[in-house]
């Protein structure tokens, strides 16, 4: 993202624009190789500079040093132009045959899985994501496996296959712990907590949400705090513990205020609804 500046190194839109201009204006683009050009494309997209995206794609293609780099450019070009799924599948099949093409093939297959997930074609999503995951296992791409498992977990949840979602989510957690990926852990803990709550194992869900909240507090991630506290409030409400639910929502509201951010309206609406539920019991 380019809309914040903080300890995590994110930059403002103005800073991002200056960086892009420095790297791409005039003859500066001649010093940009294909990998760097591809990394700059998402930034150009966030800045809304479609002409620069096209320039970067053209430059990346002309600067590609081998078939694998050419394949990465083709992948980015297909994505940018909203190509058909068949075109992505064809690219994946072609690049998998290259000596160093497996990471690219896995990435393309993963993208196909995401396209099917967004179209709610869950069986197809599972097929292509699993193919991507098998390649990532072969090349020991642990970070890539995290993404594969996240898609399979989401796919299972959409189909109410919660036991399978729990299996994928647990494996994802284990890999993230080994990678010491704190932000990924925060998100994955909340995902698995949601699955546990759906299965009715509330003690496990509370423990996982609490761990996610602790990480979100350490990372000063207000979105992570919101997800964890909202989940804990859900469980409190399900168990009839409205005071605890209200406490979590109140803490969530204050967190947004502390960060100088507008609190989502559902927090206030839910607090108001819980207050109405709690008030009669206090008067009895």
Feature roles, as predicted:
Residues 23, 44, 60, 64, ...:
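Eukaryotic all-alpha helical interaction scaffolds
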Residues 32, 66-69, 104, 144, ...:
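Structural signature of alpha-solenoid helical repeat junctions
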């Amino acid at each position: 993202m380019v809309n914040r500046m903080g300890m995590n190194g994110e930059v403002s839109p103005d800073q991002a624009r200056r960086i892009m201009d420095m790297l791409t204006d005039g003859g500066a683009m001649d010093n940009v190789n294909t990998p760097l050009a591809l990394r700059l494309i998402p930034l150009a997209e966030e800045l809304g500079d479609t002409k620069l995206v096209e320039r970067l794609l053209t430059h990346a293609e002309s600067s590609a040093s081998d078939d694998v780099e050419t394949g990465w450019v083709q992948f980015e070009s297909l994505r940018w132009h909203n190509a058909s799924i068949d075109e992505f599948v064809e690219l994946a099949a072609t690049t998998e045959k290259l000596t160093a093409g497996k990471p690219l093939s896995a990435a393309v297959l993963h993208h196909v899985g995401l396209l099917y997930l967004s179209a709610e074609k869950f069986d197809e999503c599972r097929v292509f994501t699993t193919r991507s995951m098998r390649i990532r296992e072969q090349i020991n791409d642990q970070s890539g496996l995290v993404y594969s498992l996240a898609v399979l977990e989401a796919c299972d949840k959409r189909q109410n296959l919660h036991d399978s979602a729990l299996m994928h989510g647990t494996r994802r957690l284990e890999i993230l712990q080994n990678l010491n990926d704190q932000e990924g852990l925060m998100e994955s803990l909340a995902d698995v907590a949601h699955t546990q709550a759906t299965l009715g194992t509330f003690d496990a869900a509370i423990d996982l949400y609490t761990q996610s909240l602790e990480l979100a507090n350490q990372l000063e991630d207000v979105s992570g705090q919101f997800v964890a506290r909202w989940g804990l409030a859900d469980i409190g409400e399900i168990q009839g513990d409205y005071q605890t639910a209200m406490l979590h929502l109140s803490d969530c509201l204050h967190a947004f205020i502390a960060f100088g951010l507008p609190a989502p309206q559902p927090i206030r609406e839910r607090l108001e609804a819980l207050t109405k539920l709690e008030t009669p019991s206090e008067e009895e």
